[in-house]
């Protein structure tokens, strides 16, 4: 891939309370990892781990909050400002220096990389030092907030004990970003250039870019309303990342689970899927589709 990234690895979702978010996502049938703190950035997270389609990459949702607003890194405070919802696409880099160099061809980027170290205990009790080289959010003209990271090990994101979800979730298949009609073409062009591939048009005001196994779908606000009429009018601050598509092993099972847990949802026949609106999922529209 042109920018030195291997995959759209995970989505960072801002939540006001990790405890409340865990309760919400558990009602939707997701297993959630224990709370973890990244002290150097002043943030806390819990993960929803899923199954990547190839070795060497991860596939998950990161629920992130700010435990103490007085001690959060200013950059992260900005990313996690405003309301709940998807705040950033995080790419897995095969060469983080190449990713930075690609961005620097078009933007000035001073001191772009955080070097983070933390301890992690494997399921068999072994202690490992995890080193993350993480870029700050890409500056300038990126239509949606993006960054990249390069961990020295990836096993912490592939723990089977947290990947057997009651809703049968298998894979983050797509993320949908919404732009105004005027922003749409430049947004598509930005990611075509970043990934070095052409977008596929999937309808009026809908473009899909699939650098590997996860699709970035860019749509206009009008097209977003057409894709998800079930959730009704949604106030969106454009541009924004608004929806995630999750592949599941049993759509009927998801419907039964959501009904049993009193999670408001709409089942549709064509294309087959179940939609949960942002009021039920920390500001994110969830679309469950057959794997």
List PLM regions with ranges.
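Glyoxalase I/VOC metalloenzyme domain signal
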Residues: 1-8, 13-32, 43, 50-116, ...
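Acidic-and-aromatic substrate-binding clefts and catalytic sites of carbohydrate-active enzymes
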Residues: 38-42
